[in-house]
From Swiss-Prot:
Subunit structure of this chain's protein: Interacts with RMDN3. Isoform 1 interacts with TMED9. Isoform 1 interacts with STX17; dephosphorylates STX17. Interacts with ITGA1 (via cytoplasmic domain); activates the phosphatase activity towards EGFR. Interacts with TRAF2; probably involved in tumor necrosis factor-mediated signaling. Interacts with MET. Interacts with FAM220A and STAT3; interaction with FAM220A promotes interaction of PTPN2 with transcriptional activator STAT3, leading to dephosphorylation of STAT3 by PTPN2 and negative regulation of STAT3 transcriptional activator activity.
UniProt-reported outcome of changing residue 182 to A: Substrate-trapping mutant; catalytically inactive it forms a stable complex with physiological substrates including INSR and EGFR. Accumulates in the cytoplasm upon stimulation by insulin or EGF; isoform 2
Region (Mediates interaction with STX17), start-end ranges: 376-415
Lineage: Eukaryota, Metazoa, Chordata, Craniata, Vertebrata
Region of interest (Endoplasmic reticulum location), ranges: 346-415
Species: Homo sapiens
Catalytic site: 216
Name of the protein in question: Tyrosine-protein phosphatase non-receptor type 2
Modified sites of kind Phosphoserine: 52, 293, 298, 304
GO molecular function terms attached to this record: integrin binding; non-membrane spanning protein tyrosine phosphatase activity; protein kinase binding; protein tyrosine phosphatase activity; receptor tyrosine kinase binding; STAT family protein binding; syntaxin binding
Residue ranges occupied by any Tyrosine-protein phosphatase domain in the UniProt entry: 5-275
Keywords: Cell membrane, Cytoplasm, Endoplasmic reticulum, Hydrolase, Membrane, Nucleus, Phosphoprotein, Protein phosphatase, S-nitrosylation
């Protein structure tokens, strides 16, 4: 028998009401002050000008000259869940990121984006990818890679975070979802839930640890989807009746703009409905998720579906998948789930390889531009100093000559 959420999902699908529901949530969301993010000294710590933490829920760095970081503490008391939702670190904020992880006693970092997506840099490389440790002298931390477990669509790193001043070390789990497209949704609820339950099984989300740090690029779309699904499943485990819209509105009191598109909202419903099967005691469901996710295949890279760009919000586009909405969407939730999980493997792999090549090329181009800019700066500095140094050299020759002549003159007079 369909649950209340399943009936609500079917109704929203049948009436094509995802966009209106999403707009309702946006319009009913409260806006709170975020003045600190706009201080002149903090502007270069924000990845996007219009995604800022609220003053009342922002994470404050302790014992720092400037306590600002673009991160929000989302505290859902009834679920006994706390998350730190943050942007993808910038090159100048990686040190603050690790300081926050240390001070908040975080056990895991959940990363839901790639470094480069659609030829745009979405996040700095803030963790080591080889045996060489990374030093963050500004805040006094080093990070070392202990192990790496690479799956087809996610990777788990085990990192050692060391406080250089005290010598104390902590082990941090880094869960990296590598195929979730920006403004999009994962390939299937099965793959997403398989990943979510891997994070859960590590104990990193439990209340006896500091809050898990969850980020994508802006820290609101994919991060909001992850947090919403996990929170709703926890509430269902406790036997509570849940209203997904109300839960999301409550979470939006802590960080602006959580869930960026109607597609992400629809996917959240699908993942919650599918995840509820495990909560209700279906012991085989997690095994089925793992099989459907094909996590043991060779890693592949994400491909984003074609989008219809409809409007802008928080500096980001709201896109709906280009699909012909027909009566087939009303054929039942199970078939929708199954259809979402299927794809053409060969075609997908080719697209993913092309996307990876583009990303690699974009990264190389950016590095080349940085080198050219540095060379240009050096050239301009040299052009500025060259005439000054030439004049100084000329004056030095005159002074030395005058000194020598003066010395010889006095020597002759002395004789």
């Amino acid at each position: 028998m369909p649950t209340t959420i399943e009936r609500e999902f079917e109704e929203l699908d049948t009436q094509r009401r995802w966009q209106p529901l999403y707009l309702e949530i946006r319009n009913e969301s409260h806006d709170y002050p975020h003045r600190v993010a706009k201080f002149p000294e903090n502007r270069n710590r924000n990845r996007y000008r219009d995604v800022s933490p609220y003053d009342h829920s922002r994470v404050k760095l302790q014992n720092a000259e400037n306590d600002y970081i673009n991160a929000s503490l989302v505290d859902i008391e009834e679920a006994q869940r706390s998350y730190i939702l943050t942007q993808g670190p910038l090159p100048n904020t990686c040190c603050h990121f690790w300081l926050m992880v240390w001070q908040q006693k975080t056990k895991a970092v959940v990363m839901l984006n790639r470094i480069v997506e659609k030829e745009s840099v979405k996040c700095a490389q803030y963790w080591p990818t080889d045996d060489q440790e990374m030093l963050f002298k500004e805040t006094g931390f080093s990070v070392k890679l202990l192990s790496e477990d690479v799956k087809s669509y996610y990777t788990v790193h085990l990192l050692q975070l060391e406080n250089i001043n005290s010598g104390e070390t902590r082990t941090i789990s880094h869960f990296h979802y590598t195929t979730w497209p920006d403004f999009g949704v994962p390939e299937s609820p099965a793959s997403f839930l398989n990943f979510l339950f891997k994070v859960r099984e590590s104990g990193s989300l439990n209340p006896d640890h500091g809050p898990a740090v969850i980020h994508c690029s802006a820290g609101i779309g994919r991060s909001g989807t992850f947090s919403l699904v996990d929170t709703c499943l926890v509430l269902m485990e406790k036997g509570d009746d849940i209203n997904i819209k109300q839960v999301l509105l409550n979470m939006r009191k802590y960080r602006m703009g959580l869930i960026q598109t109607p597609d992400q909202l629809r996917f959240s419903y699908m993942a919650i409905i599918e995840g509820a099967k495990c909560i209700k005691g279906d012991s085989s469901i997690q095994k089925r998720w793992k099989e459907l996710s094909k996590e043991d295949l060779s890693p592949a890279f994400d491909h984003s579906p074609n989008k219809i760009m409809t409007e802008k919000y928080n500096g980001n586009r709201i896109g709906l998948e280009e699909e012909k909405l027909t009566g087939d969407r009303c054929t039942g939730l199970s078939s929708k789930m199954q259809d979402t999980m299927e794809e053409n493997s060969e075609s997908a792999l080719r697209k993913r390889i092309r996307e990876d090549r583009k990303a690699t090329t974009a990264q190389k181009v950016q590095q080349m531009k940085q080198r050219l800019n540095e060379n240009e700066r050096k050239r301009k500095r040299w052009l500025y100093w060259q005439p000054i140094l030439t004049k100084m050299g000329f004056m030095s020759v005159i002074l030395v000559g005058a000194f020598v002549g003066w010395t010889l003159f006095f020597q002759q007079n002395a004789l």
